[in-house]
């Protein structure tokens, strides 16, 4: 392929179903108490967050990832989780809470340099006629003692989502090299 054809092919407009990178955050030395994406535009139908995360929590091999939309910390959220670690299955629910417990992530008690991975889909984030929902898949491998979890969340608000804030459930900081990437998904 000639260089001109390659440039032409790579410069096409996004098609329905394509994911476009909106923003990324990589936590620097010293960690970060939170990560927030702000001023999210309305060019997409759905959002997706892909993250690899580790926190400073030392009380267990995992920590939780919390999500709040548009700065709302009132009891307008609900969430569900099912998962397991290869030996034990679990199911959890939270209703009328101030955040969505969105994922299990690695903690400082997990093996050295181990990060949890999660993919979170925020559906119809700009639709002002319905509450906002998300679904997620998360996992941690800890030398054979891993954890896998599927979850969903609800924000009982019809406002378009313009910001997403991530914090820890038990820890106080995301560790250096934790990485969050926000994508927008086009639709027809």
Map each language-model feature to its residues.
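Surface-exposed molecular-recognition determinants
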Residues: 2-188
């Amino acid at each position: 392929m000639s260089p001109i054809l390659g440039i032409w092919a790579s410069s096409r407009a996004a098609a329905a179903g394509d994911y476009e990178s909106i923003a990324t955050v990589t936590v620097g030395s010293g960690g970060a108490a939170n990560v927030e994406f702000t001023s999210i535009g309305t060019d997409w139908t759905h959002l997706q967050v892909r993250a690899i995360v580790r926190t400073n929590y030392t009380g267990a091999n995992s920590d939780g990832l919390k999500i709040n939309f548009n700065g709302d910390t009132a009891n307008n959220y609900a969430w569900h989780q099912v998962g397991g670690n290869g030996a034990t299955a679990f199911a959890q629910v939270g209703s009328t809470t101030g955040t969505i417990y969105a994922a299990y992530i690695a903690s400082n008690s997990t093996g050295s340099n181990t990060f949890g991975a999660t993919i979170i889909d925020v559906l119809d984030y700009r639709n002002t006629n319905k509450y906002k929902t998300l679904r997620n898949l998360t996992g941690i491998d800890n030398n054979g003692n891993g954890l896998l979890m599927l979850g969903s969340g609800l924000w009982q608000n019809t406002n378009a989502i313009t910001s997403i804030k991530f914090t820890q459930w038990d820890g106080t900081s995301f560790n250096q090299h934790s990485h969050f990437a926000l994508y927008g998904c086009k639709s027809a």
